[in-house]
Amino acid sequence: MMHPVASSNPAFCGPGKPSCLNEDAMRAADQFDIYSSQQSKYSHTVNHKPMVCQRQDPLNETHLQTTSGRSIEIKDELKKKKNLNRSGKRGRPSGTTKSAGYRTSTGRPLGTTKAAGFKTSPGRPLGTTKAAGYKVSPGRPPGSIKALSRLADLGYGCGTAAFPYPMMHGRAVHGVEETSSEVKPPNE
């Protein structure tokens, strides 16, 4: 919205002109024509000149490719050489991680030293855990001959129980009969 502006300029508001407002209205229309022509001048699509892409020397690019290719080949050869040393059952297989639970070739858990008190042999078949019931110190599974010989040393025969404390069978049986007779109504 345009507001009329009072001016002391005689060219703008002269004594021979009827009113400044009419002149302003005409000038405003002329100005809009100017704006529209200037707007079309600036609003046309700008055509950019196609930029020429500058390429580096092809010698440098091939040089970079050969050096990177060589470094990859060298890394692969080093990995193959490392895997040659891992033959047999020692260590963990190549391609596995330490978190997979493989023990080192010494038989102790990973991350421990010999000074930590781990024996070189785990004392139980490989692949079993301590929770499987194998004793680590004697190196034999439970139920072995030594355990049977200990029972023989205790002096129990085949007719007696291995449990040294007497069981109270009579009391438990009578208690069950009493509770069952109270719950069941007599048939008589």
Curated annotation (Swiss-Prot):
It comes from the Eukaryota. It holds the Pfam family DUF5568. Keywords: Isopeptide bond, Phosphoprotein, Ubl conjugation. Residues 1-10, 94-107 have a biased composition (Polar residues). Residues 1-20, 79-142 are annotated as: Disordered. Residues 80-92 have a biased composition (Basic residues). Belongs to the UPF0461 family. This is UPF0461 protein C5orf24. It comes from Homo sapiens.
